[in-house]
């Protein structure tokens, strides 16, 4: 227990020190194949949508004659891959940054999008990533994350979502499931894997909650002045995850995203922290059985909290590319968000809510459940992790979380 207290202090230091230190129409985009000029090279951030982007690229090439190459970075490796690819002669023409912090590294490579056709399709200027008067990026998806749950298993345990309104009530349900897991045949949580395919869920997405609440309290919007007010809350939700899961806390360093997905899909766990993007991987559970809860961490007034909703996905066009390639890339982007095929692929096949005029009602039950919280007057939690100082900072938090879990 003494070592656990030491590692707990390391976790506080990793967060607090890092924070202070860091601190048109579809026809517009169509062209005759014989007149096709330029090419598109898209470095995709989302491994879970790789297949859909590959299919969409082929469809666009078939329709226009413009070559579209899609390379998908491995989970957690996007920045490293982007640096490597940008150093090549055939660099990506379309890439993405996660917000202001990510933009700082790539702003000299960003073409000004403010006069582009795709910018005119945005439903709000809030979805543009600005660098002064320059529109350096455009959000292409709005997503939500929280605690996905299996309604049937929760009912079997004797509860419903109505019984969970804050951290204390959630803790009661979770620990009761753990106390009866042998009889029930399932655990409360999926594994909180801390390998590279899964650790972002906790070192980034879960860490957003204490940052969000301190930003809200202090009226700040960056980590320079943060004090770490809610780090104890961060620790207690992490304790709940790792002590009531399908595996021992000491095993988390080798557990993967696929392990957690399998835990959930096979009915071995009720709760699974993830987001709307995970729908295609878990839809076999059945739409009637899928729900999503806010991530409660024990903050006063959290009964009025909704789901974490926002974006860290901003398209940027490489200003160093040739004029033909830049135009081809702009045309491809516009086609994706205006054409029937493009919009269907993004909204239906990828399950996205897109911040463009032709967004379709989602078939993704997690999107609709998340939206219902807002419709019911619950306050969505903004995504503030794009203001985290660096990937190195996040990795420091991840290492502290892993060490903390490994201490018996």
Model-derived segments and spans:
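Hinge/lid segment of periplasmic solute-binding proteins
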Residues: 98-149, 201, 205, 291-294
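Short, solvent-exposed loop/beta-turn-alpha elements that line the ligand-binding surface or hinge
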Residues: 112-126, 189, 193-196, 211-236, ...
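Extracytoplasmic/periplasmic substrate-recognition and gating elements
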Residues: 62-63, 157, 246, 284-349
């Amino acid at each position: 227990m003494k070592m656990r207290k030491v590692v707990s202090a390391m976790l506080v230091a990793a967060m607090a020190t890092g924070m202070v230190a860091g601190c048109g129409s579809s026809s517009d985009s169509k062209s005759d194949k014989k007149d096709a000029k330029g090419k598109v090279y898209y470095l995709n951030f989302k491994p879970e949508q790789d297949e859909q982007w590959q299919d969409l690229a082929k469809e666009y090439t078939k329709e226009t004659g413009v070559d579209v190459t899609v390379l998908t970075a491995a989970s957690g490796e996007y920045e490293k891959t982007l640096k490597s690819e940008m150093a090549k002669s055939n660099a990506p023409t379309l890439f993405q940054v996660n917000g202001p912090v990510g933009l700082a590294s790539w702003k000299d490579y960003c073409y000004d999008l403010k006069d582009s056709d795709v910018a005119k399709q945005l439903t709000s200027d809030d979805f543009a990533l600005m660098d002064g008067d320059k529109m350096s990026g455009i959000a292409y998806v709005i997503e939500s994350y929280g605690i996905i749950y299996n309604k049937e298993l929760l009912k079997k345990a004797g509860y419903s979502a109505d019984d969970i309104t804050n951290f204390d009530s959630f803790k009661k349900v979770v620990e009761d499931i753990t106390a009866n897991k042998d009889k029930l045949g399932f655990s409360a949580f999926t594994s909180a894997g801390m390998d590279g395919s899964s650790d972002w869920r906790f070192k980034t997405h879960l860490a957003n909650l204490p940052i969000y609440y301190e930003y809200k309290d202090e009226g700040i919007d960056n980590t320079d002045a943060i004090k770490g007010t809610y780090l104890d809350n961060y620790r207690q939700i992490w304790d709940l995850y790792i002590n009531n899961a399908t595996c021992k806390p000491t095993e988390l360093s080798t557990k993967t995203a696929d392990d957690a997905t399998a835990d959930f899909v096979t009915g071995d766990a009720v709760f699974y922290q993830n987001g709307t993007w995970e729908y295609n991987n878990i839809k076999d559970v059945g739409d009637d059985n899928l729900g999503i809860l806010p991530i409660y961490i024990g903050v006063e007034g959290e009964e009025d909290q909704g789901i974490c909703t926002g974006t860290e996905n901003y398209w940027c066009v490489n200003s160093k590319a040739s004029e033909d390639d830049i135009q081809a890339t702009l045309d491809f982007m516009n086609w994706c968000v205006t054409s029937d095929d493009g919009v269907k692929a993004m909204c239906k096949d990828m399950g996205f809510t897109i911040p463009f005029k032709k967004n379709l009602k989602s078939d993704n039950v997690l999107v609709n459940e998340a939206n219902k919280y807002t419709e019911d007057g619950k306050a969505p939690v903004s995504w503030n992790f794009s203001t985290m100082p660096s990937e190195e900072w996040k990795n420091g938090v991840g290492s502290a979380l892993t060490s903390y879990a490994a201490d018996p």
